[in-house]
Amino acid sequence: MDRISNLPDEIICHIGSFLSAREAAFTTVLSKRWHNLFTIVPDLHFDSSVKDGESLTDFVDRVMALPASSRVNKLSLKWWFDEDTDSAQFDEDTEPEDTEPAQFDQINRSLRVVLKRGVADFYLWVHGKQGYTLPFEVFTCETVTKLSLGSGFAIDFLPENALLPALKTLSLYHVRFYEFGRCAFKTLLASSPVLEELTVCGVNWELWKWSRTVSSSSLKRLTIMRKQWDAFDDSDFKSISFDTPSLAYLYYSDYVPKEYLSVNLDSLVETKLYLCPEENYMWGKGDEKRFNPINLLHGLKNVETLNLYTIMTAEMFYVFREALPVFQKLSHLSVNLSNFCWSSMPMLIKKAPNLKTLNIDGPLHYESYYRCAGDIFCECVSEYSFLVSCPLEVLKITEYYGSFRELMQMKHFLEKLSCLELVEVHSQATGERKLKLIADLERLPRASSKCKFEVVS
């Protein structure tokens, strides 16, 4: 007994979390200190995918048996039912079978109890295509700081007294929002006055009924991630606005709407973009008249780190190059242009007068598919004059094979980048082949005497 009593409070609380409510009640008779500590339940977990695990009914009974004075730090409930296998399955990337209405009632009974117990971390994954509705108490909890909701159900409206005064992190997975009188999504953000991080995963904006505005004065990190890239209907995908003046980080993966009506991203420091027009993926002739992403592009003017994940994203910058701002603060640029033309590269370099690090995520580009095989360099980079005034210090290339044509293009980089200090290339070469690759690079003339090479296998 003395050995256990001498343990720190957090260890005793952890031990107590494995006891049933009945067992915990018996142990509290042994010590006043234990009585106080065992009213704290660090975690409540239920996962229907665990084979031979606790049943939903047993979990609900366990929650309902919690003493009125108990406090719950974290709830994690993952549930759906697969009728074909008569067992619960859980996978965030697959579509599950629907949960039965009777099970909805059981789940919500337990949620209401936990929400009254001072819960801080609330994770709920319940598949409810056929009418699941979150209890209103989710949107009036004063203690929750981290809220994660999924998957497949809709949030139609919030209660009039909706307020989450402590919520800092909100994650939404395949959740849809509608509006009945007022926009549920807008109301949720407005009811979270200290929200700092928002993740919207599996988003299909065009299927929502909403204000088409992401608005939060406190938000610092925003992740928007589309999962489904087929069967896209843009008939009701006209515009999106961002009013997030404190946002420092943006990850944005989606189709481009027809227009960004209003964009406030003045505090943005780091941006990662994966954007494409409609289902054809590539920008084509006439798209500059059908789309207007200019407000978004101007909203990026203060970024310091910019990652353009795809050729489609880089091409958007090229198509609207006349309207691009100068990115005075941009010091780190990553681009993935695959084997396509680098037409956007000279323009991006010129628009970033203080660029220090360029990461080419992929191979060097030395010829176009539309030119004869004898041409080493594509017209888009043939002169390389855009490099002369670039203050680049670090050049990284994630796919390098050491071919003659790659060496010739590398020669152009090295001869014109007078501030270059490090060239880092990633190669699968090993042994003597790697030594030859390094030796070939070392023989190239350099405008910068400080330039060193690093080959990463």
From Swiss-Prot:
Keyword check for Repeat: yes
UniProt key word Magnesium: no
Domain F-box stretches: 1-49
LRR repeats, residue ranges: 53-79, 147-174, 177-202, 229-254, 283-310, 337-362
Signal peptide, first to last residue: none
Superkingdom of source: Eukaryota
Record SMART domains: FBD
Alphabetized UniProt keyword annotations: Leucine-rich repeat, Repeat
GO BP annotations listed: anther dehiscence
Protein's recorded name: F-box/LRR-repeat protein At3g62440
Phylogenetic placement of the source organism: Eukaryota, Viridiplantae, Streptophyta, Embryophyta, Tracheophyta
